[in-house]
Swiss-Prot record:
May mediate the 2 consecutive oxidative decarboxylation steps in the biosynthesis of the prenylated hydroxybenzoic acid moiety of novobiocin, an aminocoumarin family antibiotic that targets bacterial DNA gyrases. Pathway: Antibiotic biosynthesis; novobiocin biosynthesis. GO terms for molecular function: actin filament binding; lyase activity. One of its GO terms (biological process) is antibiotic biosynthetic process. Pfam families: Aldolase_II. One of its GO terms (cellular component) is cytoskeleton. Keywords: Antibiotic biosynthesis, Lyase. Coiled coil: none annotated. InterPro entries: Aldolase-II_Adducin_sf, Aldolase_II/adducin_N, Aldolase_II/adducin_N_sf. Its EC number is 4.1.-.-. This is Decarboxylase NovR. Belongs to the aldolase class II family. It is an enzyme of class 4 (lyase).
Length: 270
């Protein structure tokens, strides 16, 4: 097993997230990627549930404020200029003209507060994520793609309606602990990432894994990957750098589909 890890390419094999000299440059980059991620999820049909669905990204300069997609704005038309910056304590908009989905934000703000390592939190109402969450069980290591979540996700099994109290958000954040994802019983999926791109990849992948699991369970009794192998594969594929890199083709495909958004891309540091 140690040889399998030793044979993995080092970090220098992969593309690296950019580093910025100024807060303004970093903020422009994050807001653009934020809008592109929402367009990506729109293509997957993850924006078809009315007011539901939120991506928050920590502002690089202003502590405890988060960029968010505004309530009731379609993902498929969003631009960086549409995003709002929201105070983590009051949930008031401090930059922009719209309001945030307060129930979703109560989850996100508490996760950000409990996990300062997390740049982004994603919670969307997907068909397969909601269906699998109804079983209130962890995702088994059924395929290679599920292994990044092996021993790296949790289940919150206390659905009590809309998350309108901060304490409910705190309980979810506490249950998440240091993991990259949590399944909310009867509700859906939440993923986090040290980068927005990693969080977006984990969310895309987790929903796909839920779909695969539901299909396999319906067909019979699938054979899971042994724990030792699942643990190794998770270490091989589950890093945030791998998550960031895995998302890059999806980001680039979203830009190719939406040339209007591509024209808004800020210049990267040289």
């Amino acid at each position: 097993m140690s040889e399998a890890l030793a044979n993995m390419p080092g970090d220098d094999y992969f593309r690296q997230p950019p580093v910025f000299d100024t807060y303004a440059e970093h903020r422009a980059y994050l807001k653009f990627r934020h809008a592109v991620a929402l367009r990506h999820f729109a293509r997957l049909g993850f924006d078809q549930d009315g007011l539901a669905g939120l991506i928050t990204v920590a502002d690089p300069e202003h502590a405890d404020t988060y960029w968010a997609n505004p309530l009731a704005h379609p993902f498929s038309t969003i631009t960086p200029a549409d995003l709002i910056r929201v105070d983590g304590d009051s949930a008031e908009t401090v930059e922009g003209q719209r309001r945030v989905n307060i129930a979703a934000f109560n989850i996100h703000a508490e996760i950000h507060r409990a996990r300062p390592d997390v740049q982004a939190v994603i919670h969307l109402h997907t068909v397969y994520g909601r269906a699998f969450s109804a079983f209130a069980r962890k995702l088994p290591p059924l395929t290679q793609d599920a292994c990044p979540f092996f021993e790296d996700h949790e289940v919150f099994d206390d659905f009590t309606g809309l998350v309108l109290a901060k304490d409910d958000g705190r309980r979810i954040a506490k249950q998440l602990r240091g993991h990259k994802a949590i399944l909310l019983k009867n509700h859906g999926l939440v993923t986090v990432g040290e980068t927005l791109d990693a969080a977006a990849w984990w969310f895309t992948l987790l929903d796909t894994c839920c779909h695969v699991q539901l299909l396999a369970d319906a067909a019979g009794k699938p054979e899971e990957i042994p724990a030792e192998v699942a643990r190794l594969t998770g270490r091989q594929l589950g890093s945030h750098l791998l998550g960031w890199n895995s998302y890059q083709p999806l980001h680039e495909a979203a830009l190719a589909r939406d040339p209007d958004l591509a024209t808004m891309e800020p210049a990267l540091p040289s």
